[in-house]
């Protein structure tokens, strides 16, 4: 691992206030690389200075890149929420969670503020006094719907310049000639009548006038047919068919007074995806999807809170730029206090009250009033952190009450489940979009080959990482395999580091050397012919126990806690598959024997990647040299600056951060780190359990494994009763009492 640069700017714990606030990390050039908020700054910031192995991989990269830390004290959590989002928008920090769209979504816009309103398709929501419908998933569907609506409601679609030109020349545009515009520019229709057409179009889009209007057209068609006006009847029939299609696309799914945004959520360790349905007046008016990379070890509740802040800050800012949050700051040294005025919603609330008064006076809703970006109700699958503060903030934005809740039953629960399913599918698409793209994968491998000076693209890449606690306890290593730039989890391996004396390696470099030595002395590495081992040769006896020369345990190919395949590699150079007894257990421990059953190691990698800089690369190169392997390239990816190191070079190779090659190396490195730290935590948990159980008579290794699988931790066992212990297979009353007594004495 690289040196810990956090000591250069670590503040005293007593200097950090135990108050709500927002903090900024800056790099060596003064750029803000991360903005965060905290209910208690002291508790939150001290977490960043705990041992590196306890931090999320991306958090490790962030704190090692940082060179200074600043914080700002605020009065309430709501103010920290506002200030954090404002700073994220201002500084665009590279390590912040940013929910991103995979595309720009189209909207149907109606310019309600103009004397002669117009309708058009747009991908922006920044105009005031404009009503927007959407977002829609496909722009061609929206344009098709608008084309059908214009045949029934021929309203203006031209820009202001085109409209004024037609007024001056007295000649309308082509749409007027084909019946898709009523030509208010040349006074073929009065302004009030044209506005009523716009209201009817909006009424169909909102679902308020769709079915009643179709029913009226149907009656008119029948009357025209009865009076033998067949051309009029045919025209009305076509209008009905076109409107039916539009109305079906905006089918009512709830009562007409329901205004809600329904969110779905899906996530894994590295990424999260969110899908939203927008329900207005009881109908689904649009949908949208976001995805985000997990920058640090943040839970789903905090992710959902961040999403709501970003979504509704953007929406409110687009529709009400004059009411954006105002922040007055006194930027001073570290720890400076800043005065904050939260989002000002007075103008927005006043507009809402005026609209409500106008509706009460006229006795009908103002169909052309801009739609509220914040609905009355927000349905989420996970209750967001700081829910009450968010509700208060959203209430100010909307100018009316807003509730956030998790739907438990009914139609809203069904729609939320549908949103969850869409989010899950989007997450899978996002994960596979780059790795499944043959062009991107080929480009990534070619970028790496060009940067490292390889003769051909590295079709098989193996990456190694070391994980341990302070002092070297529970040293483990991971090996992940990527073939054609795709993770091949069935060939992942995990190593328990023993060292020369069986007590572990003296440092990470020795552990890395041991790992690579053991890996490359397995199988047919020397003079590999590339031929796979026959399946019959891979079958071995499952009887008997492993001896002490072999690993303490084996993991089933699909039985580890992550669902990945692979096995543990432990002891003096032996890779142990499931149910295979080591035939070489009588051999002297210093002799590493070839194991022809190790078909997983029968293929050499084209490239070995290690997590670290020049020292780690030199250790890896030395291991390969000692194993007689001279045709495998080696490189290291250093976390802090994402520099690529190769053996015997004094300077690193710099790959473009946005290149496919860098993305591939980062993904390989991060996957290796994740796999290593997961195994390390598992070993620590087992070690803690065994240390507590070793002194209990009659409780050997097999019983310890059963207890671990049943209870999960020593803490849970200390809270268990004698009857709980008896539920474990093979634990009788006497052993249960012995366990209960021993654990409570400890």
From Swiss-Prot:
Regions that span the bilayer: none
One GO location term (cellular component): excinuclease repair complex
Domain UVR: 211-246
Subcellular location per the Swiss-Prot or TrEMBL entry: Cytoplasm
Gene Ontology MF: a single term: DNA binding
A biological-process GO annotation: nucleotide-excision repair
UniProt keyword list: Cytoplasm, DNA damage, DNA excision, DNA repair, Excision nuclease, SOS response
Record-annotated GIY-YIG domain positions: 18-97
Region annotation Disordered: where it falls in the sequence: 557-577
Top-rank taxon: Bacteria
SMART domains in UniProt: GIYc, HhH1
Membership in a protein family: Belongs to the UvrC family.
Subunit (UniProt): Interacts with UvrB in an incision complex.
Function: The UvrABC repair system catalyzes the recognition and processing of DNA lesions. UvrC both incises the 5' and 3' sides of the lesion. The N-terminal half is responsible for the 3' incision and the C-terminal half is responsible for the 5' incision.
Protein's recorded name: UvrABC system protein C
Taxon lineage: Bacteria, Bacillati, Actinomycetota, Actinomycetes, Bifidobacteriales
């Amino acid at each position: 691992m690289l040196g810990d640069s956090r000591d250069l700017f670590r503040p005293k714990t007593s200097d950090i206030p135990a108050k709500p606030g927002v903090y900024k990390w800056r790099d060596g050039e003064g750029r803000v690389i991360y903005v965060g908020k905290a209910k208690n700054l002291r508790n939150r910031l001290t977490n960043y200075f705990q041992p590196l192995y306890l931090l999320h991989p991306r958090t490790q990269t962030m704190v090692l890149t940082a060179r200074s830390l600043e914080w700002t004290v605020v009065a309430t959590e709501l103010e920290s929420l506002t200030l954090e989002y404002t700073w994220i928008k201002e500084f665009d920090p590279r390590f912040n969670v940013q929910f991103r769209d995979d595309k720009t979504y189209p909207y149907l816009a109606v310019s309600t503020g103009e004397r002669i309103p117009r309708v058009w398709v747009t991908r922006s929501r920044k105009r005031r006094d404009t009503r927007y419908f959407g977002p829609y998933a496909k722009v061609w569907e929206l344009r098709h719907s608008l084309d059908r609506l214009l045949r029934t409601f021929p309203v203006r679609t031209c820009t202001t310049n085109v409209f004024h030109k037609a007024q001056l020349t007295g000649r309308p545009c082509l749409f007027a000639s084909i019946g898709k515009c009523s030509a208010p520019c040349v006074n073929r229709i009065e302004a009030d009548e044209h506005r009523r057409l716009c209201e009817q179009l909006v009424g169909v889009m909102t679902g308020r006038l769709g079915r009643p209007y179709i029913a009226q057209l149907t009656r008119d068609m029948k009357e025209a047919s009865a009076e033998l006006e067949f051309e009029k009847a045919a025209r009305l029939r076509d209008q009905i068919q076109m409107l039916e299609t539009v109305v079906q696309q905006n089918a009512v799914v709830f009562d007409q007074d329901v205004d809600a945004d329904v969110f779905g959520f899906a996530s894994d360790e590295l990424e999260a995806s969110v899908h939203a349905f927008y329900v207005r007046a009881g109908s689904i008016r649009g949908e949208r999807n976001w995805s985000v990379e997990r920058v640090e070890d943040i839970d789903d509740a905090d992710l959902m809170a961040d999403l709501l802040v970003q979504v509704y800050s953007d929406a409110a800012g687009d529709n009400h730029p004059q009411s954006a949050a105002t922040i007055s700051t006194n930027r001073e040294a570290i720890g400076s206090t800043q005065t904050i005025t939260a989002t000002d919603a007075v103008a927005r609330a006043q507009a809402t009250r005026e609209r409500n008064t106008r509706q009460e006076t006229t006795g009908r809703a103002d169909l052309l009033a801009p739609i509220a970006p914040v609905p009355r109700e927000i349905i989420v699958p996970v209750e967001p952190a700081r829910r009450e503060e968010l509700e208060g903030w959203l209430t100010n934005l909307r100018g009316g009450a807003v509730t956030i809740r998790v739907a438990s039953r009914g139609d809203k629960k069904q729609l939320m489940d549908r949103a969850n399913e869409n989010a899950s599918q989007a997450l899978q698409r996002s994960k596979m979009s780059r790795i499944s793209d043959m062009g991107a994968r080929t480009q990534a491998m070619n970028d790496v080959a060009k940067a490292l000076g390889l003769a051909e693209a590295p079709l098989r890449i193996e990456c190694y990482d070391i994980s341990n606690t302070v002092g070297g306890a529970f040293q483990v290593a991971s090996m992940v395999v990527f073939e054609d730039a795709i993770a091949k989890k069935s060939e992942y391996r995990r190593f328990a580091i023993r060292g020369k004396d069986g007590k572990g390696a003296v440092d990470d470099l020795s552990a890395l050397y041991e790992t690579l030595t053991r890996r490359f002395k397995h199988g047919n590495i020397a003079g590999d012919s590339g031929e796979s081992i026959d399946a019959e040769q891979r079958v071995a006896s499952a009887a008997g126990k492993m001896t002490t020369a072999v690993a303490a345990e084996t993991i089933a190919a699909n039985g580890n806690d992550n669902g990945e395949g692979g096995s543990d590699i432990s002891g003096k150079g032996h890779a142990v598959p499931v149910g295979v007894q080591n035939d070489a257990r009588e051999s002297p421990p210093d002799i590493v024997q070839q194991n022809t059953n190790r078909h997983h190691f029968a293929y050499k990698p084209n490239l070995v990647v290690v997590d670290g800089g020049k020292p780690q690369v030199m250790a890896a190169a030395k291991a390969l040299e000692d194993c007689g392997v001279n045709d495998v390239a080696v490189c290291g990816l250093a976390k802090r600056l994402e520099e690529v190191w190769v053996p015997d070079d004094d300077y690193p190779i710099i790959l473009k951060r946005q290149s496919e090659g860098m993305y591939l190396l980062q993904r390989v490195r991060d996957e290796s780190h994740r796999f290593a730290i997961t195994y390390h935590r598992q070993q620590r948990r087992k070690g803690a359990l065994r240390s507590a159980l070793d002194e209990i008579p009659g409780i050997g290794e097999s019983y310890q494994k059963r207890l671990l699988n049943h209870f999960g931790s020593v803490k849970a066992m200390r809270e268990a009763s004698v009857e709980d212990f008896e539920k474990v297979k093979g634990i009788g009353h006497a052993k249960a009492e012995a366990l209960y007594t021993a654990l409570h004495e400890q």
